[in-house]
Design a protein with these regions (language model features):
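Outer-membrane beta-barrel proteins
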Residues: 1-325
């Protein structure tokens, strides 16, 4: 009788402790991609072939409170042989007021900015030696996945916007503030999205400022994007423009192409151009093959940031196998 009473008391206590506890929805997803890269360059150190791998596991938890708030937690873990670090880890609180994100995650520039290379699935970025020129039309990440606070307004019609702030520390002076917006509308059967973002990282001398503005038009299976970006900091005044297009075919294949150009007004003559084509093919659900071919050309300026900077041009070919779970 005493054992039964103790067991009943334990069960009642456990029930009381868990009655007010929320039961979270949990999801686990993973994505991995393997690539073969072949580069033909007039710089010997850049010429040759390499393998690449990029894998990630995401754990997501979500809970809806009695008051109507949605509380979420996400952690993304890199899962490559040489990289097993936590990439992002943040908590979110969402409701009628919008969404608040706290922790290590992207700044709002990544949420709202539109770049020309968004039209394709895989972007090859042939780097050039000791050059600080832009290689795409995206906003500069600046604070990356550093610990920050971000706020996103609730959607109002087709308009959304947000702001984020990353604190550099008690004695730091390199805080990063970012703002971004999207506006989507329908016109003549087309879906048009205008997106932009701006970010500033403070400094004791010259701040670093970056902006992006892009427009995306979706008409049936056809997508077109045009974008521009800028980056201003010590000894840099870089502007980049580009355009991209993709078309979804009936057989599951997606064709894409893009072009971009970047110039630094403070290094006269410094210029980077890149154009590429892409073919995506869905082999099976969750398995995709992507082929990219990119041509690039980098011209050095008359006032280079480094004496080691050299001109470079060539072709980058890439085969990527992507799997998602």
């Amino acid at each position: 009788m005493r054992k039964l009473l103790l067991s009943s008391t334990a069960l009642a206590t456990a029930a009381a402790l868990t009655a007010g506890a929320a039961v979270a929805d949990v999801s686990i997803s993973a994505a991995t991609e393997w690539s073969y890269n072949s580069r033909s360059s007039n710089v010997t150190a850049n010429d040759g072939t390499t393998f690449g791998v990029d894998s990630e596991i995401a754990f997501k938890f979500s809970n809806k409170t009695d008051s109507g708030l949605t509380i979420g937690y996400v952690v993304e873990l890199e899962s490559d042989d040489d990289n097993t670090l936590i990439n992002e880890s943040s908590i979110s609180i969402a409701g009628g007021f919008g969404k608040l994100v706290l922790g290590g995650n992207d700044g709002v520039g990544d949420n709202y900015g539109i770049e020309a290379e968004d039209a394709i699935a895989e972007e090859s970025t042939p780097t050039v030696m000791s050059a600080s020129i832009g290689t795409d039309t995206d906003i500069s990440a600046m604070s990356g996945d550093a610990n920050k606070v971000a706020y996103h307004l609730p959607a109002m019609g087709g308009f959304t916007a947000g702001a984020s702030f990353a604190d550099s520390g008690a004695v730091g002076s390199t805080d990063t503030t970012a703002f971004g917006f999207n506006y989507t509308m329908e016109a003549a059967g087309n879906t048009i999205t205008i997106g932009g973002a701006t970010a500033t990282t403070g400094a004791t001398t010259t701040d670093t400022d970056s902006q992006n503005l892009g427009v995306k038009v979706v008409s049936g299976n056809l997508t077109f994007i045009a974008a521009q970006s800028s980056l201003e900091k010590v000894d840099e005044d870089i502007s980049s423009t580009g355009a991209g297009v993709s078309y979804k075919m009936a057989n599951g294949m997606v064709l894409g192409a893009y072009t971009m150009k970047s110039e630094d007004d403070l290094d006269a003559g410094e210029e980077y151009t890149k154009s590429g084509v892409e073919v995506q093919y869905t082999i099976a659900a969750g398995l995709t093959a992507v082929i990219n071919v990119d041509d690039y050309d980098y011209k050095i300026g008359t006032d280079n940031d480094s004496a080691d900077t050299v001109a470079d041009s060539g072709t980058m070919s890439k085969l990527t196998l992507k799997a998602s779970f």
